[in-house]
């Protein structure tokens, strides 16, 4: 095992793979986590993200997940894996992998700037991708906005770090308390789809409240009450309560209900101006009523197109 301080190298450092003999030059440090340090790098042909591992076994687990995703057609949850090897430096061996460099904005930053509707769209995208991950036998584990990136250009959510990915049935070892159902006393840390789904709901709480909150003496009731009283969460309280209570066993189930509630909420929002005009029709001419109805119809149609582009 290698300490994180031992994984900090100067820009321009050249890495040579022990087995595959590929060369990579480190351009700049991108970040460090519990299991390693990531650099922007360059191979002979392209820009890459290079992860130097603190623990070889953890890296092997992450590489195996990325390989499985590479076998799926049209997957888009994580980065493409280009290479994984060992680097011999000063008598020590550091395991590393070279991956697709994902250029964008961390979801944790995007959620602070975007309207709440976007948070729902991002979670819908995430649920589609989690369905694929669960299908091949893994849960994400440490699912949180900091481990997700919003691609630029476009509004596609991708994952930056599969270090916490865990095989179904095993115990999740890497987690962040706020997004962990074990912390909230609402289920254990067994790797199953519902573990990731709970984290998705907590992303909605974070987006709606603008911060992480502390648990109370009755955490389950605390979360349910928030879903019923927080204005931005109220339209989605059915999905939130079902998830908190562990009623969804597949990401596709949660996604179906969340999409339905999002469309219903948007339809209701667009109908309110028309209803206001109808209540005042004694004071309003027929043409203005038609205008309000037409405007609402156009807005609803535009929103449906938006959903098709970014969600479906």
Describe each model-derived feature in a short phrase.
Residues 266-312:
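C-terminal single-pass membrane-anchor helix
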Residues 133-151:
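Catalytic-loop of the protein kinase fold
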Residues 23, 27, 34-63:
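ATP-binding glycine-rich loop module of kinase domains
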Residues 90-106:
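Conserved short submotifs of the Hanks-type protein kinase catalytic core
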Residues 230-244:
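Conserved C-terminal C-lobe helix
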Residues 79-95:
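Short beta-strand micro-motifs within the conserved protein kinase catalytic domain, predominantly
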Residues 122-123:
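Activation segment signature within eukaryotic-like protein kinase domains
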Residues 248-268:
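Terminal C-lobe "cap" of eukaryotic-type protein kinase domains
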């Amino acid at each position: 095992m290698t300490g994180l301080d031992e994984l900090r190298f100067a820009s321009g450092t050249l890495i040579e793979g022990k087995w595959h003999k590929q060369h990579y030059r480190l351009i700049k440090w991108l970040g460090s986590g519990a299991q390693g340090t990531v650099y922007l790098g360059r191979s002979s042909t392209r820009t890459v993200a290079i992860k130097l591992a603190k623990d070889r076994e953890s890296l092997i687990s992450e590489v195996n997940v990325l390989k499985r995703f590479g076998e799926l057609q049209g997957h888009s949850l994580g980065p493409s894996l280009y290479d994984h090897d060992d680097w011999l430096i000063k008598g020590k061996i550091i395991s590393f992998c070279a991956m697709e460099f994902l250029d964008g904005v961390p979801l944790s930053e995007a959620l602070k700037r975007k309207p709440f509707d976007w948070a729902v769209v991002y979670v819908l995208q995430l649920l589609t991708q989690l369905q694929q991950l669960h299908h091949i036998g893994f849960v994400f584990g440490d699912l949180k906005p900091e481990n997700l990136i919003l691609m630029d250009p476009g509004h596609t959510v991708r994952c930056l770090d599969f270090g916490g990915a865990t095989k179904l049935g095993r115990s999740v070892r890497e987690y962040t308390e706020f997004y962990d159902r074990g912390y909230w006393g609402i289920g254990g840390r067994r790797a199953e789809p519902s573990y990731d789904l709970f984290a998705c709901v907590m992303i909605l709480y974070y987006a709606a409240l603008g911060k992480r909150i502390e648990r109370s003496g009755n955490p389950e009731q605390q979360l349910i009450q928030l879903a019923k009283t927080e204005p931005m969460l109220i339209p989605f309280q059915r999905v939130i309560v079902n998830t908190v209570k562990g009623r969804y066993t597949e990401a596709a189930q949660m996604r179906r209900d969340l999409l339905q509630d999002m469309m219903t909420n948007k339809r209701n929002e667009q109908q309110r101006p028309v209803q206001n005009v109808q209540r005042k029709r004694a004071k309003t001419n027929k043409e203005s009523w038609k205008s309000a109805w037409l405007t609402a119809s156009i807005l609803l149609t535009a929103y449906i197109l938006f959903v098709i582009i970014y969600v479906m």
